[in-house]
Swiss-Prot record:
ATP binds at residues 204, 326, 352-355. One of its GO terms (biological process) is gluconeogenesis. GO terms for cellular component: cytosol. The gene is pgk. This is Phosphoglycerate kinase. It comes from the Bacteria. It comes from Citrifermentans bemidjiense (strain ATCC BAA-1014 / DSM 16622 / JCM 12645 / Bem). Belongs to the phosphoglycerate kinase family. Pathway: Carbohydrate degradation; glycolysis; pyruvate from D-glyceraldehyde 3-phosphate: step 2/5.
Length: 399
C-alpha cells in the first residue's frame, strides 16, 4: 500500500480534520517559545486544509508530563504562536478528550482551528491505548499525521487512533521528510557520504551497520569516535569511551572496509583538562592525547581531512555534532563542518536535534537542502526501520 497525502483526500469542505502535529518546542522560564521551526513546518498542511474549508483540530504533546496535567506543559504557548503565524485565532481547548471538547468541536465553523490540550496529560497516549485513542478522535471525519518527529513512537495519537477513521493521510511535512529520505537512501546520486557525530556510539551503532551497505564514505566525529580510536589501540586519555561497545564498533569498522566503504576518523583533536568552558585546552594529534585529558572537539587537521572527503560528494547525510559545540572552545569543528556541508554542491540532508541547532546557530540553514524535524525518527529511518506512524499510513493509505 502507498501513503495517501492530504491533497489526495476528496472534498474536505466542512469536514472535521484531526491533525497530529509535533509542537514539542523549546520554552524559556517564562513559557516563551525560543525556536518555532516545528510549528512553521506544518503551516503548508494547515493552510491547505483552511483553503479547503475544513474544520481543523490539532493535537500535539509538549515535554514529558508523564500522564499528569502540569500547566508548564500546556499547549497554550504553541496555540498563541500558531495564531500569530496564521493571522487568525487558534482556540485552545481545556482538554484533549471529554464532553466539553466534543461540544467545542461540534460548534466549529469551516475554517476554524482548535488546538487540543497536551495529549501526554493522559497515560493512555504513551501506552497506545485504544480507548484513549477513540476518545481523542472526538468523532472527527479525517485523520492526518504531519508529525514526523514522533512517528517512531507507537503512541495513541500516532498509531492506535488510525483505527478510528475511515480516511487517514499524511501531511506535506511528512511528504517532504519521506521524499528527501528516499532521495538519500533509496536511489541516491553518488558518491553518498554519511557524517555521524554526537557523544555515544550506542545511539548510532545500528545506523552504522545499516549504512555500511548503502554509502560510499562514512565520516565519524564527536565523542563516539573515541570508542573506535581506543579499539584501534590509541590511548585516548579521559575521552568518552563505551568500553562495552569497542568490539562491536571494530566489527562495524571492518565490515565497512570489507565492503569498500571509506571510513574517516579524527586525526587530531582539541583536548581539555576538564569538562568546563573555562578549561585549559590544546590541539594535539590523536597519538598524543595527554593522560587525564579529554578530547572535546575535532582538530584543524581533521576538519581539513573531513572537508576533502566531502569534495566529490553528490549526496550528504549528517547526524550529530563533531564536538561539545555548546561551549565556544569546542565549537570550531562542528561549525567548520556546517560550512563544508552548506557550501558543497551535493544534496544535503541534516538530521534533527543538535545538528539542526548547530546549523541554525551558524546561520547556514538556507544553504542546506533539507533539515529534518525529527531526531529519533530520522535515526530510526537510517537504521532501516519502519516507523509505526508511517507503517499505519501505508497500510491504510488507499483502502
Amino acid at each position: 500500500m502507498s501513503i495517501r497525502y492530504i491533497d489526495e483526500i476528496e472534498n474536505l469542505s466542512g469536514k472535521k480534520l484531526f491533525m497530529r502535529v509535533d509542537f514539542n518546542v523549546p520554552l524559556d522560564d517564562h513559557q516563551n517559545i525560543t525556536e518555532d521551526t516545528r510549528i512553521r513546518a506544518v503551516l503548508p498542511s494547515i493552510n491547505y486544509a483552511l483553503d479547503q474549508k475544513a474544520k481543523i483540530i490539532l493535537a500535539s504533546h509538549l515535554g514529558r508530563p508523564k500522564g499528569e496535567r502540569k500547566e508548564k506543559y500546556s499547549m497554550a504557548p504553541a496555540a498563541k504562536r500558531l495564531s500569530r503565524l496564521l493571522g487568525k485565532e487558534v482556540k485552545l481547548a481545556s482538554d484533549c478528550i471529554g464532553d466539553e471538547v466534543k461540544a467545542m468541536i461540534n460548534a466549529m465553523q469551516p475554517g476554524d482551528v482548535i488546538m487540543l490540550e497536551n495529549v501526554r496529560f493522559y497515560a493512555g497516549e504513551e501506552k497506545n491505548d485504544a480507548d484513549f485513542a477513540k476518545a481523542l478522535a472526538n468523532d472527527c471525519d479525517v485523520y492526518v499525521n504531519d508529525a514526523f518527529a514522533v512517528s517512531h513512537r507507537a503512541h495513541a495519537s500516532v498509531e492506535a487512533i488510525t483505527n478510528c477513521f475511515p480516511v487517514v493521510a499524511a501531511g506535506f511535512l511528512m511528504k517532504n521528510e519521506m521524499n528527501y529520505f528516499e532521495k538519500a537512501m533509496k536511489n541516491p546520486i553518488r558518491p553518498l557520504v554519511a557524517i555521524l557525530g554526537g557523544a555515544k556510539v550506542s545511539g548510532k551503532i545500528e545506523v552504522l551497520e545499516n549504512l555500511c551497505d548503502k554509502v560510499d564514505k562514512i565520516i565519524i566525529g564527536g565523542g563516539m569516535a573515541f570508542t573506535f580510536l581506543k579499539g584501534m589501540g590509541y590511548n585516548v586519555g579521559k575521552s568518552l569511551v563505551e568500553d562495552n561497545l569497542i568490539d562491536t564498533a571494530m566489527k562495524t569498522y571492518e565490515k565497512a572496509r570489507a565492503q569498500g566503504v571509506k571510513f574517516y576518523l579524527p586525526v587530531d583533536c582539541v583536548v581539555a583538562d576538564q569538562f568546563n568552558p573555562a578549561a585549559e585546552t590544546k590541539v594535539c594529534p590523536i597519538q598524543e592525547i595527554p593522560e587525564g585529558w579529554m578530547a572535546l572537539d575535532v582538530g584543524p587537521a581533521t576538519v581539513t581531512l573531513f572537508t576533502e572527503a566531502l569534495q566529490n560528494a553528490k549526496t550528504i547525510v549528517w547526524n550529530g555534532p563533531m564536538g561539545v559545540f555548546e561551549m565556544d572552545a569546542f565549537s570550531r569543528g562542528t561549525f567548520a563542518m556546517v560550512s563544508a556541508v552548506a557550501n558543497s554542491y551535493a544534496l544535503t540532508i541534516v538530521g534533527g536535534g543538535d545538528t539542526d541547532v548547530a546549523v541554525h546557530r551558524a546561520g547556514e540553514y538556507a544553504k542546506i537542502s533539507y533539515i529534518s524535524t525529527g531526531g529519533g525518527a530520522f535515526l530510526e529511518l537510517l537504521e532501516g526501520k519502519k516507523l509505526p506512524g508511517i507503517k499505519v499510513l501505508e497500510d491504510k493509505g488507499h483502502q
